Amino acid sequence: MKVSVLAAVAAFAAATAIAGPVRPAGVGNDKYLIELAPGKTQWVTKNEKHQMKAAGQTFIDITDEFGTGFTASQPVSANYPKNSRHSSIVAPIIANLSKENLMRDLKAMIEFNNRYYESQTGVESATWLMEQVQKAIDASGIQGAKVEKFENQFQQFSIIATIPGSESTVVIGAHQDSINEQDPEGGRAPGADDNGSGSVVVLEALRGVLGSKALQAANNTNTMEFHWYAGEEGGLLGSNAIFKKYKSDGRQIKAMLNQDLAGFVKKGGPEQFGLITDNTNQELNQFCKMIVKKYASIPIVDTKCGYACSDHASADRSGFPASMVAETAFRDSNPHIHSADDVTDYLDFDHMLEHAKVAVGFMTELAMASNL
């Protein structure tokens, strides 16, 4: 990261930041409204968004909120279990999780030139992913289970798989898109870790849950949703659209677990999860720690990633409790992301399998929880 680039971005931000979402005179359709912190917004071009992303600046694109009166919400209340109560269901699911599936699925995802949200290959990769989800649902035979597209104002669509239950809903999500920060629209962006790893973890967790006869027999109390978001690299576009709609519709989203970066272990460093503690729900974070201790074989440490660093922030600002369990402490994250070098050579599939265990434990325990 060059100092000159950072200085230029800082100067640009200082010159163009505005106090609130007020459209300045002369702003055209080529400008996008982004939020860098609560209440701190500015209008930028797509290229400027890319430059800021490359310089390490995180943000959420709120262009479609302009003039709507949208305001961030406080999280809805939820009552999370203090201890695991359904290990007899979770343990067999975990035992059947497949590292080979993770490897196979990720190999397929990185074969697309990129999964950029405004590229044709971004649409093709989303189509492939949705086909895998549909196959898993078809194989399960679970009545009412379904997968749907969530269309966006850009090319790539988001994907939502649902296993029905009560109005209370538990979500596990991951963004499916990738980006090459040097050439966003056409550059090679395999996105093995960012975020092919999280995408295949959520897919394997879905397969595990769908394949559990014990869970089917127990008749899950709460609705389960598995999400794959489009356009995270453009400013949490896909997830923000979904959770804003859920807020508008009065949905009862009781918990959301974000899986973004799930495969990298720093050479010579400790193998551990990173629990994101900023812009997340502290009660749900404590539940995540319990799940990790119960079902995973590696520890978890607190870490921070900044405002709008990933899709949990979309759930959080719409008033839904959210957590993110990342591959490690943020300072030790994969240095190869957002480039052509984000490949599987740097990933640890055993570590990825640990993420899948946590995802299954999180979803199953909360799906069966009464009075969430």
UniProtKB/Swiss-Prot annotation:
Names of the cofactor(s): Zn(2+)
Enzyme class: hydrolase
Molecular function GO labels: aminopeptidase activity; metal ion binding; metalloexopeptidase activity
Recorded GO CC terms: extracellular region
Binding site for Zn(2+) 2: 194, 233, 338
Cellular compartments annotated: Secreted
Listed CDD domains: M28_AAP (cd03879)
Cofactor note: Binds 2 Zn(2+) ions per subunit.
Keywords, alphabetical: Aminopeptidase, Disulfide bond, Glycoprotein, Hydrolase, Metal-binding, Protease, Secreted, Signal, Virulence, Zinc
One GO term (biological process): proteolysis
Keyword Glycoprotein belongs to the record: yes
Disulfide bonds: 305-309
Residues reported to bind Zn(2+) 1: 175, 194, 260
Function: Probable extracellular aminopeptidase which contributes to pathogenicity.
The protein's assembly and partners: Monomer.
Protein name: Probable leucine aminopeptidase MCYG_08380
Organism of derivation: Arthroderma otae (strain ATCC MYA-4605 / CBS 113480)
Organism lineage string: Eukaryota, Fungi, Dikarya, Ascomycota, Pezizomycotina
